[in-house]
């Protein structure tokens, strides 16, 4: 039985992971960390940790783990450059799996969008993401991952070609432009569309999650896989072998 620690256990995702583990025959929720918890006790009770907290919470976790290595599955989004660099350096002494979206379907969407971007170089690319009205960051981490992915397929620097919105008389769309748009409303769990548009035809790749259990189950699958891996930085593609 794999003992899983939940970092950010009182949040939406932490709660969902706990529920999904209740019926799991291979793993159990053995430790819970939220504000006011003790890292030493938390680390001693688990074999692997799943983190869905905040950027600052994730940073604190990584700083402690550097001296107390433990396999980490990180699903927290909105990390800045410093925090990403901290994750990279920490992965030298422990296995870390980082994914902005733990859905297995989104992993396939990422793969398909890369192939489409590479093959359809004359097509314009537009990305649209939709989430609930309580989501704090925009664009979503998943949308940015998808954008980086399609830009990489065309050897483009995303920071130079990304557009976040359009208003007024802005002129003709540039050839390499990649738009990433965000909508917020209601209780939408998560929806992402990567569109490829050309004269006379277009292709749209869509993924929608209808339950947070989708992400929780993906994170648990990653934790089970990661606990037996060597030190290094992984993503969900490594877990799925795609």
Swiss-Prot record:
One of its GO terms (molecular function) is oxidoreductase activity, acting on CH or CH2 groups, NAD or NADP as acceptor. It is an enzyme of class 1 (oxidoreductase). It holds the Pfam family DapB_C. Disulfide bonds: none annotated. GO terms for biological process: diaminopimelate biosynthetic process; lysine biosynthetic process via diaminopimelate. It is found in: Cytoplasm. Keywords: Amino-acid biosynthesis, Cytoplasm, Diaminopimelate biosynthesis, Lysine biosynthesis, NAD, NADP, Oxidoreductase. The active site is at residues 131, 135. One of its GO terms (cellular component) is cytosol. The keyword Metal-binding does not apply. It catalyses: (S)-2,3,4,5-tetrahydrodipicolinate + NAD(+) + H2O = (2S,4S)-4-hydroxy-2,3,4,5-tetrahydrodipicolinate + NADH + H(+); (S)-2,3,4,5-tetrahydrodipicolinate + NADP(+) + H2O = (2S,4S)-4-hydroxy-2,3,4,5-tetrahydrodipicolinate + NADPH + H(+). (S)-2,3,4,5-tetrahydrodipicolinate binds at residues 132, 141-142. SUPFAM superfamilies: Glyceraldehyde-3-phosphate dehydrogenase-like, C-terminal domain (SSF55347), NAD(P)-binding Rossmann-fold domains (SSF51735). PANTHER family: 4-HYDROXY-TETRAHYDRODIPICOLINATE REDUCTASE 1, CHLOROPLASTIC-RELATED, DIHYDRODIPICOLINATE REDUCTASE. Catalyzes the conversion of 4-hydroxy-tetrahydrodipicolinate (HTPA) to tetrahydrodipicolinate. This is 4-hydroxy-tetrahydrodipicolinate reductase. It comes from Campylobacter lari (strain RM2100 / D67 / ATCC BAA-1060). The lineage of its organism: Bacteria, Pseudomonadati, Campylobacterota, Epsilonproteobacteria, Campylobacterales. The gene is dapB.
């Amino acid at each position: 039985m794999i003992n899983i620690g939940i970092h950010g256990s009182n949040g939406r995702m932490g709660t969902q992971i706990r529920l999904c583990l209740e019926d799991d025959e291979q793993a159990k929720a053995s430790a819970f960390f939220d504000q006011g918890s003790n890292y030493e006790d938390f680390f001693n009770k688990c074999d692997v940790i799943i983190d869905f907290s905040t950027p600052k919470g994730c940073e604190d976790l990584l700083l402690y783990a550097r001296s107390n290595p433990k396999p980490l599955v990180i699903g927290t989004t909105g990390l800045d450059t410093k925090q990403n660099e901290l994750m990279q350096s920490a992965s030298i002494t422990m296995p870390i799996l980082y994914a902005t979206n733990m859905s297995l379907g989104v992993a396939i969407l990422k793969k398909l969008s890369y192939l489409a971007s590479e093959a359809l170089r004359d097509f314009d690319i537009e990305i649209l993401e939709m989430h609930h009205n309580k989501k704090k960051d925009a664009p979503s981490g998943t949308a940015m991952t998808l954008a980086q992915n399609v830009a990489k397929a065309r050897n483009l620097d995303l920071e130079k070609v990304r557009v976040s919105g359009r208003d007024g008389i802005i002129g003709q769309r540039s050839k390499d432009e990649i738009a990433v748009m965000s909508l917020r409303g209601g209780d939408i769990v998560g929806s992402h569309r990567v569109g490829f548009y050309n004269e006379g035809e277009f292709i749209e790749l869509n993924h929608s999650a209808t339950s947070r259990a989708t992400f929780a189950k993906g994170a648990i699958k990653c934790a089970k896989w990661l606990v037996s891996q060597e030190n290094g930085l992984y993503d969900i593609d490594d877990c799925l072998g795609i």
